[in-house]
């Protein structure tokens, strides 16, 4: 194994599979970066910053299966996607706004 170092890029692929029912996997690329040491901490920490931003397809989301915290995370993620990509997408801005509208 190789220890993580700032600047390394890896894939974050959380997933959940309910046997015989459904499964989901969401994947983004993240970059390793220094993270502030907590007060009283005795060593430097690393964290991750998401590099790839893309709306999660709403047609695949069953909001009733998500907790309030999960819905809040999804809406915050979509708000970030819209804010960061809006200046870059030109004619696709309307599509982006629709894809990133709040679920909760």
Model-inferred region functions:
Residues 1-104:
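Charged, cofactor-coupling segments
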């Amino acid at each position: 194994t190789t220890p993580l170092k700032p600047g390394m890029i890896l894939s974050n692929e959380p997933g959940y599979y309910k046997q015989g029912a459904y499964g989901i996997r969401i994947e983004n690329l993240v970059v390793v970066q220094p993270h502030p040491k907590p007060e009283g901490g005795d060593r430097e920490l690393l964290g991750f910053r998401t590099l790839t931003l893309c709306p999660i397809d709403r047609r695949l989301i069953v909001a009733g299966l998500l907790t309030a915290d999960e819905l809040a995370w999804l809406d915050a993620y979509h708000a970030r996607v819209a804010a960061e990509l809006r200046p870059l997408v030109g004619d696709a801005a309307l599509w982006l706004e629709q894809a990133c509208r709040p679920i909760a």
